[in-house]
């Protein structure tokens, strides 16, 4: 796939390479275990490094579903990245909100889909309710498809 430098993509990890990918997909009844933004060169979000980061990485289309966003949110993504750079992964929030359903999460830590959905909703106001910490990668995919953003 040829990526355009002025475009932003949302990418969803669909491979079962790691055991936790299989577990997440099973637990969330989803096709995807992870999501991030991609600018054609860098992944932007929170992932294996357990912190918000930008990482130069080519994508294997057999492992990722890649969708061009038809809205321009490149600047908001980079602004939110600057605001949250280095923020850690919210493991406790996963346990308290998604496993035990206590609806607790950290205000300064994120899951991949929480980080992505925060930006999407700040700009487009399309996510209801605003419980970003409970949103899965599959939820984001379905919201973006429903609103014809991908």
Predicted regions and their residues:
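Protein maturation boundaries and topogenic segments
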Residues: 1-8, 141
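Glycine-rich catalytic cores of cysteine/serine-nucleophile enzymes that process amide/ester linkages
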Residues: 9-69, 96-107
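Generic secondary-structure boundary/loop-capping signal
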Residues: 20-21, 86-89, 132, 137
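Generic recognition of short, well-ordered alpha-helical interface segments
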Residues: 72-76, 111-114
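A structural motif
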Residues: 73-95
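Activation targets extended, charge/polar-rich intrinsically disordered C-terminal tails
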Residues: 97-150
